Amino acid sequence: MLWLALFFGRFSRLEAPQRLVIKKRSDRGQANLPMINERIRFPKIRAIDADGTQLGIMHPRDALRIAEERNLDLVVVSEDAQPPVCRIMDYGKYKFEQEKRAKEARKKQHTADVKEVKMRYTIGEHDYQVRLRDTIRFLKDGDKVKATIMFRGREIQHANLAKDLLMQLAADSAEIGEVQQEPSVEGRNMIMILSPKRT
């Protein structure tokens, strides 16, 4: 009987499940938002007008009032300065210009890859033309081309034929490419590297 009392006593003392309380943060995601208009929380700022004239050090509320009178925004341009520097401007136009500049910078930042074109020294004419087209396409894209001729067994004895084929590839793509590394034997391969011509 004692075990029954202990068993039922244990269940009677079960606590009701605790409710999970989720605290909402009002500033969630605020860190990623730009510091403009009402989001500026500094006690004092250095304000600059839309035409570049200094308005002096003032409370952000006063600078915001000036910006609103001109239908413009107050934007923090230098948060680290003492006091932080804010400028009166059209924020939509400013953001568009920044995105445009970043896009142009990304376009100019093409990194040259090394593409490989493999063939045998006994390659047929059609297959050679395909490799030549690939080489020209890679060079036009601004990439380097590693032309590789693979040898099997005793074929390495014909290294002179392989070198002639690589030099023919260099001559056929000479309009847009130049030899960066002369043909050389590496293991069971002969390799030549072409790079786009500097304009």
UniProtKB/Swiss-Prot annotation:
UniProt signal peptide: none
Transmembrane segments: none
InterPro entries referenced in this protein's UniProt entry, alphabetically: T_IF-3_C_sf (IPR036788), T_IF-3_N_sf (IPR036787), Translation_initiation_fac3_CS (IPR019813), Translation_initiation_fac_3 (IPR001288), Translation_initiation_fac_3_C (IPR019815), Translation_initiation_fac_3_N (IPR019814)
Main location: cytoplasm
Key words, A-Z: Cytoplasm, Initiation factor, Protein biosynthesis
Gene Ontology cellular-component terms listed: cytosol
Molecular function, one GO term: ribosome binding
Domain of life (superkingdom): Bacteria
Subcellular location, record wording: Cytoplasm
One GO BP annotation of this record: ribosome disassembly
Role noted for this protein: IF-3 binds to the 30S ribosomal subunit and shifts the equilibrium between 70S ribosomes and their 50S and 30S subunits in favor of the free subunits, thus enhancing the availability of 30S subunits on which protein synthesis initiation begins.
Family the UniProt entry places it in: Belongs to the IF-3 family.
HAMAP family: IF_3
Subunit architecture: Monomer.
Name listed for the protein in its UniProt record: Translation initiation factor IF-3
Lineage: Bacteria, Bacillati, Cyanobacteriota, Cyanophyceae, Gloeobacterales
